């Protein structure tokens, strides 16, 4: 990369800032006829920058001067004299670093890719998903490395983020949600990519590649209920997805204002802080739930899976939020109870809900599902508000 500049041109470095062109010419003139002495100066201060270029008429003279003067002292400073290289050499020199730099990003990408890939691979199946999920999560974390930071903030729970990072592992393991929380988002991204895209972008980026929904879900599902859910999730998940996707849309549609506005408006805050995952999901799920409840069979398991997922979410969320944890749990619980009541009363879906969802989940699912609908807007919001104010 380094090309010699024109023959006879020498680079003189390490000069005393007091050394001027005349001094250089006097010193190097004894080796032969000098065509040009170029002392590099600072544009603003006009002071010597400590290096110069001396061009000899004869390349042989330049070689002699370089051989004799290199390392010699001039005006009290040892100078470096060598054949000048083209300026590109500088960029060239710098160039190599860039490759590393560029390489770095690729690495990052690779990491991301790996993460997604990992997730993706695993996502293919539940079991894998778990691993995948984990790996995913971890990959995510690793790929997300930077993200985590972002992630931390997003939760806006301050405390939670750290918790999340730590929990993410555990949480992940427990719910597989830690990583997944993001996933939930991923899902959101799925469902409401718009909403989350910002956030998701990071995670989703990973997630999406990951098939966030799937992997995550899978992860969730697999993790959450590895076996039962895995399969179920798997089968349903797609459905869920579909439903969810539609559900989301519907839920969004149902709660467009809410889904979007809340989510969007708060968008991410809420998503993060509140139930974005939970609420939104819940809502979405609810919507699904409802839509799903129509197909209870599917609905319940998925929803139920979903609810658990939600729960997971909540946990993850919680893990995520940490505060949210308590919050979500409390929230879910509170909500669940409140919501359940509200939702159920509002919805008058108690049976299906209860039936559809096991009680605990019920609370979650129903809460998530129930409330959102009836109380969804008001309830969930208030809940949200409450949750928020509470925390």
From Swiss-Prot:
Biased composition (Pro residues): 151-164
N-acetylvaline modifications at: 2
SMART domains xrefs: RRM (SM00360), RRM_1 (SM00361)
Phosphoserine found at: 88, 91, 165, 174, 261, 328-330, 332, 352
Biased composition (Gly residues): 109-120
Ranges of Basic and acidic residues composition bias in the record: 61-80, 194-215, 241-274, 338-347, 380-391
Sequence segments annotated as region (Necessary for the association to nascent RNAPII transcripts and nuclear localization): 186-236
Modified residues (Omega-N-methylarginine): 125, 144, 164, 172
GO CC annotation terms, alphabetical: catalytic step 2 spliceosome; euchromatin; extracellular exosome; nucleus; supraspliceosomal complex
Chain segments carrying region Necessary for RNA-binding: 333-391
Biological process terms in GO annotation: cellular response to interleukin-1; membrane protein ectodomain proteolysis; mRNA processing; negative regulation of mRNA splicing, via spliceosome; positive regulation of mRNA splicing, via spliceosome; positive regulation of transcription by RNA polymerase II; protein homooligomerization; regulation of alternative mRNA splicing, via spliceosome
Keyword Iron listed: no
InterPro entries: Nucleotide-bd_a/b_plait_sf, RBD_domain_sf, RBM, RBM1CTR, RRM_dom, RRM_dom_euk
Entry keywords, A to Z: Acetylation, Activator, Glycoprotein, Isopeptide bond, Methylation, mRNA processing, mRNA splicing, Nucleus, Phosphoprotein, Repressor, Ribonucleoprotein, RNA-binding, Spliceosome, Tumor suppressor, Ubl conjugation
Modified positions (N-acetylmethionine) in chain numbering: 1
Domain (RRM): residue spans on this chain: 8-86
Pfam families for the chain: RBM1CTR, RRM_1
Comp. bias regions, Low complexity: 323-337, 362-371
PROSITE patterns, per the entry: RRM (PS50102)
Coiled-coil regions listed in the entry: none
Subcellular location: Nucleus
An annotated Gene Ontology molecular function: protein domain specific binding
Subunit structure: Homomultimer. Found in the supraspliceosome complex. Identified in the spliceosome C complex. Forms a complex with ILF2, ILF3, YLPM1, KHDRBS1, NCOA5 and PPP1CA. Interacts with CLK2, KHDRBS2, KHDRBS3, SAFB/SAFB1, TRA2B and YTHDC1. Interacts with ERAP1; the interaction is RNA-independent. Interacts with PPIA/CYPA.
The protein's name: RNA-binding motif protein, X chromosome
Name of the gene encoding the protein in the UniProt record: RBMX
